[in-house]
From Swiss-Prot:
Family, similarity comment: Belongs to the HAK/KUP transporter (TC 2.A.72) family.
Protein function: Transport of potassium into the cell. Likely operates as a K(+):H(+) symporter.
Protein's organism: Xylella fastidiosa (strain 9a5c)
Name of the featured protein: Probable potassium transport system protein Kup
Localization per Swiss-Prot or TrEMBL: Cell inner membrane
GO CC, one annotated term: plasma membrane
Organism phylogeny: Bacteria, Pseudomonadati, Pseudomonadota, Gammaproteobacteria, Lysobacterales
Sequence intervals crossing the membrane: 21-41, 61-81, 110-130, 148-168, 180-200, 217-237, 258-278, 296-316, 348-368, 377-397, 408-428, 432-452
Record keywords, A-Z: Cell inner membrane, Cell membrane, Ion transport, Membrane, Potassium, Potassium transport, Symport, Transmembrane, Transmembrane helix, Transport
Length: 634
């Protein structure tokens, strides 16, 4: 398993035990794709596609589902993309940062790759809204099969489960998380056993493993078969999680879990549902629950709901983690991040993200009303993210001379053709619900781009009005102000310019501390900064130091802890009780005559005003912080 050092520690943290890592991976990584049998085959034969559940059509759809799992998950993700890691970390943001590192500094390509990464991240957040909604709703819809009169209660029960899930987030998942693996493993075993039971009733369904049935389906239905791919892709939703969670569990554990547990059980269940439909075509209304014996229906509903909650939890936790990475890389404003575990670094809770997701999930459930309507919206976010991941992987592989060119272009053609077909099959359902995740993606993309552009304009304005630090200090020492005991740490984004906070301190307080540190915090495009690279201390003149602290994008920046290591690096001993942190708090004034359009200026001002204060984000004690204001027009 990938390990790291604590954000500010001087020593590394030992590796976590990997004794139960495969079981843990089953619980976290495969919850989303594991609940896909609840709705995939049901959606493929919904009235939206006009298919008749006859022998050839059922085998054709099953063949497409099986080979979608093989091509997209087994070959693309497990065999190829999971070989590309950013110091052990995966996911679209890690891949974006890794790809940008292969490009010349300041090149246009870095900007284009950044745009792709931001939009892929935006679509992932859209996925984080739809997955909890469709997973829990599909599980609870089993009540309609058991008791048809319960249909009116499906949406209220779904909302109750989801609201309770989000309300519990602030307590963390350290204790209950230990049950995720066993429960999800039980889920996979149960659906596999049910699949075997139904296959025994119609064993000819096993012929669907032959890809010729999928090809026959395409030949028979022509262009109409492209529409059906919009339902088939539901079988691979959650495939991106294999790559995104690679840093938590390691590629080997995820590969073993997929090949030996998840893939066989999913295949058995899909084939079992198909066998049921071959024997009883009327079961196509809800083949998953219809395939279960009456005595096991209620236990399966309970188990399915638990599996759906776990799948939702994985997406929620992933949204927190992705938000934290985006904050570190400067894509979104700083937000309050709470750590919910004293023993596990990565377990965090982001209240703003939590309540935003809950609001959107509630609106999604109420707006769509059932899983069939929601399925039309689900695929766009998933296929869009998958396609962007493929493009980024190809761009990265092009820069790697060890990758044979012929193999690279063959992979590019196959993967882009498959991803493109799935994306097209979903985008043509724009008016049927595909607009929803695209709208979410565009809104989030706009926020992220506005924040990036606004921060750049803000830094340019402050630098333009700034004074060169190396020229300023000699003049200051010609008529030095009164010195007071202790250390002053001035946080600054540009270490070559005099911090606004220092200028205001001299102007209003007319004092200087014995030791003055100009501190710049930098986030690297790698997950974790090595301890040897954490601190860079440069003495400028007597009593003045320029300090750079580096954190990886997966780390929580703990500035005081990092500074405590300075004695080991340069003999500077930071005493927290005698150190004062000075931060400049800018008041941004929008202007119609420069920078961005005025509406984006106002949006940036709103985000900047609501960003978490620096002391909370950098874990600086509030009683050691002095904030000094400055007005900046952009």
């Amino acid at each position: 398993m990938s390990t790291s050092s604590h954000s500010g520690d001087c020593t590394a943290v030992p590796s976590n035990s990997n004794g139960t890592i495969i079981l843990s991976a089953i619980g976290v990584v495969f919850g989303d794709i594991g609940t896909s049998p609840l709705y995939t085959l049901k959606e493929a034969f919904s009235p939206n596609y006009g298919l008749t559940p006859n022998h050839d059509t059922v085998l054709g759809i099953l063949s497409l589902i099986f080979w979608a799992m093989m091509l997209v998950v087994t070959i693309k993700y497990v065999a190829v993309i999971m070989r590309v890691d950013n110091d052990g970390e995966g996911g679209i943001m890690a891949l974006t940062a890794l790809t940008q590192r292969t490009m010349p500094f300041g090149s246009r390509s870095i900007y284009i790759v950044g745009i792709l990464g931001i939009f892929g991240t935006s679509l992932f957040f859209g996925d984080g809204v739809i997955t909890p909604a469709i997973s829990v709703l599909s599980a609870v819809e089993g009540l309609e099969v058991a008791e048809p009169h319960m249909k009116a209660f499906v949406v209220p029960i779904t909302l109750a489960v989801l609201i309770l899930l989000f309300l519990c987030q602030r307590f963390g998942t350290e204790r209950v998380g230990k049950t995720f693996g066993p429960i999800t493993l039980l889920w996979f075993i149960a659906i596999g056993v049910v699949g075997v039971y139904n296959i025994a009733q119609a064993p000819e369904v096993l012929h669907a493993i032959n890809p010729s049935w999928g090809l026959h389906f395409f030949l028979e239905h022509g262009w109409h078969s492209m529409f059906v791919l919009g339902a088939v892709v539901l079988a691979v939703t959650g495939g991106e999680a294999l790559y995104a969670d690679m840093g938590h569990f390691g590629a080997k554990a995820i590969r073993h879990a997929w090949m030996y547990v998840v893939l066989p059980m999913l295949a058995l269940n899909y084939l079992g549902q198909g066998a049921l439909v071959l024997s009883n075509p009327t079961a196509i209304g809800n083949p998953f629950y219809q395939s279960i014996p009456d005595w096991g229906l209620y236990p399966m509903i309970a188990l399915a709901t638990a599996a759906a909650v776990i799948a939702s939890q994985a997406l929620i936790t992933g949204s927190y983690s992705l938000s934290s990475q985006a904050m570190q890389l400067g894509y979104i404003p700083r937000m309050n991040v709470r750590h919910t575990s004293q023993s596990t670094i990565g377990q965090i809770y982001v209240p703003t993200v939590n309540w935003t997701l809950l609001t959107l999930v509630i609106l999604t459930v109420i707006g769509f009303g059932d899983s069939t309507s929601m399925a039309s919206a689900y695929g766009v976010a998933v296929t869009g993210t998958m396609m962007i991941t493929t493009v980024l992987m190809i761009i990265y592989a092009r820069a790697n001379p060890r990758v044979p060119r012929l193999m690279l272009w063959m992979m590019a053609i196959v993967f882009i053709a498959v991803d493109g077909a799935f994306f097209y099959a979903n985008i043509i359902k724009f008016m049927d619900g595909a607009w929803f995740p695209l709208l979410l993606g565009v809104v989030i993309f706009t926020f992220m781009r506005t924040w990036l552009r606004g921060r750049k304009l803000l830094h340019e304005e402050m630098r333009k009005d700034g004074i060169n630090l190396d020229n300023f200090l000699p003049g200051l020492m010609l008529a030095p102000p009164v010195k007071v005991p202790g250390t002053a740490v001035f946080l600054t984004a540009d270490s070559t310019v005099v911090p606004h906070a220092l200028m205001h301190n001299l102007k209003h307080n007319k004092v200087l501390h014995e030791r003055n540190v100009f501190l710049t915090v930098k986030t690297l495009k790698i997950p974790y900064a090595a301890n040897s690279e954490r601190l860079k201390i440069e003495p400028i003149s007597n009593g003045f130091y320029r300090v750079h602290i580096r954190f990886g994008f997966m780390e929580t920046p703990d500035v005081p802890s990092a500074l405590m290591c300075s004695k080991d690096h340069a003999g500077i001993d930071f005493d927290p009780m005698h150190t004062t942190f000075f931060v400049s708090r800018e008041t941004v004034i929008p202007s119609a005559n420069r920078g961005m359009p005025i509406w984006r200026d106002k949006l940036f001002v709103l985000m900047h005003r609501n960003a978490a204060p620096a002391n909370a984000f950098f874990r600086i004690p509030g009683n050691r912080l002095v904030e000094l204001g400055a007005q900046v027009e952009i």
